[in-house]
Amino acid sequence: MVAEKTIKSMVSKAELPDNIKEELYAKLIEYNEKYKLKKDEIQAIIDETVREYQKALIEPGEAVGTVAAQSIGEPSTQMTLNTFHYAGVAEINVTLGLPRIIEIVDARKNPSTPIMTVYLDEEHRYDRDKALEVARRIEGTTLENLAREETIDILNMEYVVEIDPERLEKAGLDMEKVVRKLTGSFKSAEFEAEGYTLVVRPKKVTKLSDLRKIAEKVKKHRLKGLSGVGKTIIRKEGDEYVIYTEGSNFKQVLKVPGVDPTRTRTNNIWEIAEVLGIEAARNAIIDEIVSTMREQGLEVDVRHIMLVADMMTLDGVIRPIGRHGIVGEKASVLARAAFEITTQHLFAAAERGEVDPLNGVVENVLIGQPVPVGTGIVKLAMSLPLRPKRE
């Protein structure tokens, strides 16, 4: 059995990136304890790792962008075009397939179906009742959600709401709390509870249209929960309970007592960037694209997706791939002009006196030069034998 110090020294000499060295060292320690490896066996494993790593490296001049576009684009043609139910949570709809991929690469600020997966801390994750307590704190509840029936009394100029007792109890509220919350938020009306009937009497309202406006505001008013979050679903996964939410408010959900902030996640990449930073957003882009592809039974080498995520987050903010993002901001005038709105780009560049260095693929194709990809990246100079100069 080889000492840990020796293994560390052997791994540190290998020509590998630091993250692979760390992983290799951890694996070697594990296998060394399990199989009592000899020094030459450990060296053989390190050499094999270096060989495999070198085989995985791209050749200089490889057109990685084209290969990535093809590798992601081709399987995308086999994807479904409609919104399906989220795997395992039939009650919550979430965008899948090609529309979801487009949403991610377009870097849309508001996904069409935002959803959060909320994991709970040690105290709450194994007990359904405790998980329900946390779900109640998160779930957004409006008067409309609690109402069984609502009427506008024209004679008395009142808005009358019949509250469903079951829904009220499920939301963890009572009539007194409802009246208190509404009274604190609306100074232009009086609220009175008669059993499970809520009567709203607007002050200084003479027109029916004004009464309707107030009624609309009152019924949409949030009584509890996080803004942007609709219903919540509790599911058992393995031996723990997990909460799924329709709608997302990542910043606030991490502060809710009972939530495990280290595992909770959202499918809104902009929220992740704002709360956890750009590196987390990059990982989220990779994860979302990979899981969307997998959902459709498609496997794409993660390195193509990582390249896309790297390009989208390169400047420290999320940028879409397209006219308003990466392609529209290329340094080359000709590349921008070849993509979209040609004349506008050319006139603007001429006005500013821009010079195109012709470093990219598109601009070289445009003017008929060999592209700087593959063998085109190599510049050859011929060494001719020196001959004496003729007089």
Curated annotation (Swiss-Prot):
Q: Which EC class, in a word?
A: transferase
Answer whether the UniProt record assigns the keyword Transferase to this protein.
yes
Q: Which InterPro entries match?
A: DNA-dir_RpoC_beta_prime, RNA_pol_Rpb1_5, RPO1C
List the GO biological process terms.
Answer: DNA-templated transcription
Subcellular location field: Cytoplasm; Chromosome
Q: Which reactions are catalysed by this chain?
A: RNA(n) + a ribonucleoside 5'-triphosphate = RNA(n+1) + diphosphate
Predominant location: cytoplasm
- Keywords of this protein's UniProt record, alphabetized? Chromosome, Cytoplasm, DNA-binding, DNA-directed RNA polymerase, Nucleotidyltransferase, Transcription, Transferase
Signal peptide segment: none
UniProt GO cellular component terms: chromosome; cytoplasm; DNA-directed RNA polymerase complex
For this UniProt entry, the molecular function terms from Gene Ontology, in alphabetical order, are: DNA binding; DNA-directed RNA polymerase activity
E.C. numbers = 2.7.7.6
This protein's record includes keyword Transport: no
Function text: DNA-dependent RNA polymerase (RNAP) catalyzes the transcription of DNA into RNA using the four ribonucleoside triphosphates as substrates. Forms part of the jaw domain.
Q: Which family does it belong to?
A: Belongs to the RNA polymerase beta' chain family.
How is the subunit organization of this protein annotated in UniProt? Part of the RNA polymerase complex.
Q: What is this protein called?
A: DNA-directed RNA polymerase subunit Rpo1C
Give the gene that encodes this protein: rpo1C
